Amino acid sequence: MHTRTQPFTRAAVLAAAVLLVAPLSACGQIPFSGPMTTQTREIAEVDAVDLRTSGDLTITIGEEESLTITASAVAISALTSDVDEGTLVLDYGGGAFGVSRISYDLTVRSLDRVQVSGSGSVSGAGVLGPEGVVEITDSGSLALTDTHTRDLTVRIDGSGSVTLEGSSVSLDLMMDGSGDFSGEDLRTQKASASIAGSGSAWMFVTDTLRASVSGSGGLTYAGDPVQVATDVTGSGTVEIAAPR
């Protein structure tokens, strides 16, 4: 009796597993674990990047554009890397979603825009050109060093964080949510900041600062700017940084 039911039991378990995985696959909810693999993909004429996955993106400046992706063998087949009008969009295909660690290594000549639309992270040095835009629209993070721009725009919508080091003639910061901007090591001449929600920002400004805070957020600034204009509504604050 036991020997006859054992094959049936194994078959039943297998069938149950298939039934369990099938709806998950249909929804893209596949656990992307397993051995890691690396894949190189062709890209060309990239001047912006939008990271929409939970991966870690490292950007390097170089003459030859290239993209390398490291992830599990299952996950990597579902990852897309399309260039749309100069913007490299790093996403999941078909709504796929997983838990595998994803690493991107991107080499470009220069970028005008870096955007994080998911929970991923971006890092790089000397990435932006004379006019740069940095944007976070979720819970992701972005850290750029050796930044030297003429006009720099930073938008943080959500709980993400942006850290910038270097210099810019002008800086335009817009925040909505609980995000964080660390610009104490970004030397700017003219800066404007609009903070809505509970976010916090840190700036270094030497000439002119215009700041608007609504909600419970706060702006801290250093650099002893010549002109400062503030507009605060709610419990938010605009304050001078304590001497280091």
Which sequence ranges carry the predicted segments?
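Short, surface-exposed interaction patches in beta-rich subdomains
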Residues: 162-244
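Acidic (Asp/Glu) and glycine-rich low-complexity loops/linkers
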Residues: 2-14, 20-135, 146-150, 155, ...
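Alpha-helical interaction segments
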Residues: 17-18, 205
